[in-house]
Amino acid sequence: MSRDILHRYLFDNADVRGQLVQLEDSFQAMLAAQDYPKALQVLLGELMAATSLLTATIKFSGDISVQLQGDGPVSLAVINGNNELQLRGVARWKGELAKDASLPTLLGKGYMVITLTPDEGERYQGIVSLEHGTLAACLEEYFNQSEQLPTQIHLFATNAQAAGMLLQVLPSKQEQNDDFSHLSVLTQTIKPQELFDLGAEEVLHRLYHEEEVRLFEPMDVSFKCTCSRERSAGALKTLSLVELETILAEEGKIDMGCEYCTASYSFDAIDIAALFSDNADTSQTKTQ
């Protein structure tokens, strides 16, 4: 059974929708890029689950970024992805982190920045303070600010798995909250191990066995890095030829490592010369 799936569901007897996401292989692939401390592994797992839920909730075609910034020992944690739930992530930290460190302890004072870049149309950015204590509470506040929709979020992670649930009033029914309040109480009984070990149908049956739940086709979630040799070459072109030749003289080659995965791209003197030869040809073509 695949462990990297997002399920969407509706209640036929209530104006409420839900989502359930379970991550394993994609989460492990993301963690493999760096030797993250345990607390940071958990944070990235919650953030990956949160980004999956957010992406599936907002109807758009394009890219999404959910970024945590703070003045604590963790200065940055970010998940980037697209509407096809192809995600990647990275974090930066300094010093030792307690295994059970909370969000405020890890990031201090800071913000969650959610950026949507649609294939067509204008870019949108929402900012929420991290003062709400947990990542789930911050995401609930985001929906409260941007959509004005009652929303409940549950996020769980270990160093091996991540999972999450979202419960939300349908956009056209936000004034009717009785059903949502009832279902919220039921959803709050979910246990992390149930989300880690059980399939979606069994989880939903345990939570809502007296409700009429309609489960839709699952959506695959995957780890996918967008790095490439061409992108690395583009980054090198932002430096001058003199700077690059200085590095080559000292190192013999230039290695470009990706923060998001374990890929590395190596450039020698011939490669660098070819890059700037291409620039020269392009420049000449434009001036002719």
Swiss-Prot record:
Q: Where in the cell is it found?
A: Cytoplasm
According to its UniProt entry, the protein's GO biological process terms are: protein refolding
Chief subcellular location: cytoplasm
- The coiled-coil segments of this chain are none
Q: Name one GO molecular function term.
A: unfolded protein binding
Bridged cysteine pairs (disulfide)? 225-227, 258-261
Q: Does the keyword Chaperone apply?
A: yes
How does the record describe the protein's post-translational processing? Under oxidizing conditions two disulfide bonds are formed involving the reactive cysteines. Under reducing conditions zinc is bound to the reactive cysteines and the protein is inactive.
Q: Which UniProt keywords apply?
A: Chaperone, Cytoplasm, Disulfide bond, Redox-active center, Zinc
Q: Which InterPro entries does this UniProt record tie to the protein? A: Heat_shock_Hsp33 (IPR000397), Heat_shock_Hsp33_C (IPR016154), Heat_shock_Hsp33_N (IPR016153), Hsp33_helix_hairpin_bin_dom_sf (IPR023212)
Zinc in keyword set: yes
GO CC, sorted alphabetically, is: cytoplasm
Tell me the function of this protein.
Redox regulated molecular chaperone. Protects both thermally unfolding and oxidatively damaged proteins from irreversible aggregation. Plays an important role in the bacterial defense system toward oxidative stress.
Protein family (similarity comment): Belongs to the HSP33 family.
What's the protein name? Answer: 33 kDa chaperonin
- What is the primary gene name for this protein? hslO
